[in-house]
Amino acid sequence: MTQSTTPAPSASVAVSKENTVNQKTKINLLDLNRKQMRELFVSMGEKPFRADQIMKWIYHYCYDDFDQMTDINKVLRAKLKEIAEIKAPEVSEEQRSADGTIKWAIKVGSQQVETVYIPEDDRATLCVSSQVGCALECKFCSTAQQGFNRNLKVSEIIGQVWRAAKIIGALKETGRRPITNVVMMGMGEPLLNLNNVIPALEIMMDDFGFGLSKRRVTVSTSGVVPALDKLADAVDVALAISLHAPTDDIRDEIVPINKKYNIEMFLDGVRRYIAKSNANQGRVTVEYVMLDHINDSTEQAHQLAECLKDTPCKINLIPWNPFPGAPYGRSSNSRIDRFSKVLMEYGFTTIVRKTRGDDIDAACGQLAGDVIDRTKRTLKKRLQGEPISVKAV
């Protein structure tokens, strides 16, 4: 085949300003979805199918070295090495739980986010972060106490999946399953980073990416309603909603974004999402953390059932996972059981989530990472004399 003499493009081709440092920076191919990858190859004078070949090497085989891609000719490999790279964030620390859960501290610049691998008998779920810290200040969540620094880039989101897949693929231990499910339930609010989360989701579900079913990719949100509508128009994935309270007065206190988008507005947005989605099979998952004598009474169970009567859903009750400095307690098993029974009497599918990885601070609500807080939230807490949680890493 005759090779094109088209000059190699500058490193800014097909990459958004957010994911480009300067004109001399190589393009990180992990920042590109398939459409962008094809645009890059066309700009190089290559056929679009070359992008598909490269994506298979990157995501099916977890290769990051162009020279290992044996069905790519040497001239194209040389071109790619000049202008591009495949660079996933590195693991700075690994912790293993007695229950098989693995938590990785992932280095992103001078900071760290956390990614969790949760193996089960019939699946293996990867919990992925979307931001360095979180801006939403949910009172029961360790991540929220660290403040917020920045959004993760596409390569830093999909790179968590790539890095985990490479590590798990290399493990020869019995029972280590490949990743079957991804949940955007790590550090950060995914809907506040849609510009990077959406391309990452597209790569997760692309046949030339990780090829996951849309029913096995879940985005969790605390209720950024306008962004929920944008997500519905952009990509179809399973949805989980962090509700955590049956009434606005309680939710205003523990999930402060409720003061802007209250429960009625949130659930209206959820029903609009369900109407557009096939991935959810007609219902969403409601996440409800169980806080002792805060939101776990029998009366509140009845209130929750009334609140959700027009929203097709299943309900996950999550025993709260403690972290240092938190002002809450975990609901007792008896209170959780009573709460669950009330919901089931109303006909709701209700599951009490099994706690995984709490011995390594990898359970729901415990992820902390290492965040340089741009919101000055921790400073404000010190000045006000409020308790401050200790980082898990």
From Swiss-Prot:
UniProt-annotated binding residues for S-adenosyl-L-methionine: G188, E189, S220, S242, L243, H244, N321
Pfam family, one: RlmN_N
Binding-site list for [4Fe-4S] cluster: C134, C138, C141
EC category: transferase
Cofactor: [4Fe-4S] cluster
Reaction equations catalysed: adenosine(2503) in 23S rRNA + 2 reduced [2Fe-2S]-[ferredoxin] + 2 S-adenosyl-L-methionine = 2-methyladenosine(2503) in 23S rRNA + 5'-deoxyadenosine + L-methionine + 2 oxidized [2Fe-2S]-[ferredoxin] + S-adenosyl-L-homocysteine; adenosine(37) in tRNA + 2 reduced [2Fe-2S]-[ferredoxin] + 2 S-adenosyl-L-methionine = 2-methyladenosine(37) in tRNA + 5'-deoxyadenosine + L-methionine + 2 oxidized [2Fe-2S]-[ferredoxin] + S-adenosyl-L-homocysteine
Chief place of localization: cytoplasm
UniProt entry keywords in alphabetical sequence: 4Fe-4S, Cytoplasm, Disulfide bond, Iron, Iron-sulfur, Metal-binding, Methyltransferase, rRNA processing, S-adenosyl-L-methionine, Transferase, tRNA processing
Record-annotated disulphide pairs: C127-C364
Subcellular location: Cytoplasm
Active site, UniProt feature: E114 (proton acceptor), C364 (s-methylcysteine intermediate)
One GO term of the biological process aspect: rRNA base methylation
InterPro entries named in the record: Aldolase_TIM (IPR013785), Methyltransferase_A (IPR040072), RlmN_N (IPR048641), RNA_MTrfase_RlmN (IPR027492), rRNA_lsu_MTrfase_RlmN/Cfr (IPR004383), rSAM (IPR007197)
Entry EC number(s): 2.1.1.192
Domain Radical SAM core: from-to ranges: 120-359
Note: Reaction proceeds by a ping-pong mechanism involving intermediate methylation of a conserved cysteine residue.
Annotated PANTHER family: 23S RRNA METHYLTRANSFERASE (PTHR30544), RADICAL SAM CORE DOMAIN-CONTAINING PROTEIN (PTHR30544:SF5)
NCBIfam families attached to this UniProt entry: PRK11194.1, rRNA_mod_RlmN
Biological role: Specifically methylates position 2 of adenine 2503 in 23S rRNA and position 2 of adenine 37 in tRNAs. m2A2503 modification seems to play a crucial role in the proofreading step occurring at the peptidyl transferase center and thus would serve to optimize ribosomal fidelity.
Family: Belongs to the radical SAM superfamily. RlmN family.
UniProt name for this protein: Dual-specificity RNA methyltransferase RlmN
